[in-house]
């Protein structure tokens, strides 16, 4: 019998979350962002749910090829563009759109030796300062591309750094969208500005012909704890489940786990769960991180080890060897433990937890 830890992927929840995007931005085309192997869910596992999107956005060519191999004939956008001149040949072969964010990438397109009709997304660095042309250099970059016979379409693109909250005491999007609009207002072309946080928080304020929905598709709130997934109508798409494999009874002053950093203050019962940091659960998750045991919310106790962790069974009379444990997601009876609750307790974000689940965990698709 295999080790009992599984990651259940809920197709219905994926479809629900895509529908939330559509409802929020009914006049926009929707890119489903599936970078990092669909945020740890697996591109092949989410494809059926997301093929109702208008396109897929991802990072590298191998992921793009996997999408094409599944039968997708619609748009695919490389969010970081090409990494070498040779990649442009694959863009032609697989009909890929790509971001342009640097002088080098423009030069590669200018020097491409064969006829092509590239669909590019020109990125402005409107304030995040990772990729893109600063506003004062953006028009020059656009003009260079617009003069090329092998560039068929240019979409204006930017990425918000603070759409999930405030920036220096102002609404998080204000600084960047002002800089962006001032430059592109007189240039032809469609726009792609909204990420998950902007889709949900500023749907009535932003014009975005293409939206790039990422974390919201996977059942994590982009502005937690201000809003939960329930507030946005989102559903958890990944449930990391395991079982209790041992029950231990602690007396006062007895400890559990490496470092003895949890010591019982009174008699208590704990369960040992088949899940550890080698499965992708965070080693730094402290005592008190929420879990579900038999659909009842409780907490972890002690240090997470490679293959196991301990949970407090106080008040859970049904708990025994074989009891279901939900590390995040939803239980088999439908009780939800939001991944954001676990992430905050662990000092991280839901994105990291999803992406960290390792290959030794069995994935199960649930319709």
From Swiss-Prot:
NCBIfam families: alr (TIGR00492)
Keyword annotations from UniProtKB, A to Z: Isomerase, Pyridoxal phosphate
One annotated GO molecular function: alanine racemase activity
Pathway assigned to this chain's UniProt record: Amino-acid biosynthesis; D-alanine biosynthesis; D-alanine from L-alanine: step 1/1
EC number: 5.1.1.1
Cofactor: pyridoxal 5'-phosphate
Binding site for substrate: 130, 306
Gene encoding the protein: alr
Sequence positions bearing N6-(pyridoxal phosphate)lysine: 35
Functional note: Catalyzes the interconversion of L-alanine and D-alanine. May also act on other amino acids.
Entry protein name: Alanine racemase
Origin superkingdom: Bacteria
Top-level EC class: isomerase
Example GO BP: D-alanine biosynthetic process
Signal peptide region: none
The family this protein is said to belong to: Belongs to the alanine racemase family.
CDD domains, per the entry: PLPDE_III_AR_proteobact
InterPro entries: Ala_racemase (IPR000821), Ala_racemase/Decarboxylase_C (IPR009006), Ala_racemase_C (IPR011079), Ala_racemase_N (IPR001608), Ala_racemase_pyridoxalP-BS (IPR020622), PLP-binding_barrel (IPR029066)
Pfam families registered for this protein in UniProt: Ala_racemase_C, Ala_racemase_N
Catalytic activity: L-alanine = D-alanine
Coiled-coil region list: none
SMART domains membership: Ala_racemase_C
Gene Ontology terms: cellular component: cytosol
């Amino acid at each position: 019998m295999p080790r009992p830890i599984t990651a259940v992927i809920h197709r219905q929840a994926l479809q629900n979350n895509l529908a939330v995007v559509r409802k929020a931005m009914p006049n926009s085309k929707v890119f489903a962002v599936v970078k990092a192997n669909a945020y740890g869910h697996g591109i092949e596992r989410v494809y059926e749910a997301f093929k109702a999107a208008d396109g897929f956005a991802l990072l590298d060519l191998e992921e793009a090829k996997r999408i094409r191999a599944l039968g997708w004939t619609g748009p695919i956008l490389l969010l970081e563009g090409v990494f070498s001149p040779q990649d442009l040949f694959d863009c032609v072969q697989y009909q890929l759109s790509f971001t342009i964010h640097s002088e080098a990438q423009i030069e590669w397109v200018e020097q491409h030796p064969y006829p092509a009709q590239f669909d590019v997304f020109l990125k402005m660095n409107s304030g995040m300062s990772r990729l893109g042309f600063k506003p004062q250099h953006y028009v020059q970059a656009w003009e260079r591309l617009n003069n090329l016979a092998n560039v068929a379409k240019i979409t204006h693109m930017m990425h918000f750094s603070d759409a999930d909250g405030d920036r220096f005491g102002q609404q998080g999007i204000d600084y960047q969208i002002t800089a962006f609009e001032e430059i592109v207002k007189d240039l032809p072309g469609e726009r792609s500005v909204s990420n998950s946080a902007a889709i949900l928080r500023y749907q009535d304020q932003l014009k975005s012909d293409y939206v790039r929905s990422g974390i919201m598709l996977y059942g994590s709130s982009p502005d937690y704890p201000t809003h939960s997934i329930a507030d946005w109508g989102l559903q958890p798409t990944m449930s990391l489940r395991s079982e209790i494999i041992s029950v231990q009874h602690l007396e006062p002053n007895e400890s559990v786990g490496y470092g003895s950093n949890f010591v019982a203050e009174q008699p208590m019962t704990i369960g040992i769960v088949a899940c550890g940091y080698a499965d992708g659960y965070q080693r730094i998750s402290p005592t008190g991180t929420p879990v579900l045991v038999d659909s009842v919310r409780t907490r972890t106790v002690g240090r997470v080890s490679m293959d196991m962790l301990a949970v407090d069974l106080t008040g859970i009379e049904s708990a025994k060897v074989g009891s279901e444990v939900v590390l995040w997601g939803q239980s088999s009876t439908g009780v939800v433990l939001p991944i954001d609750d676990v992430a905050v307790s662990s000092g991280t974000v839901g994105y990291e937890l999803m992406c960290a689940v390792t290959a030794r965990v069995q994935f199960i698709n649930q319709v």
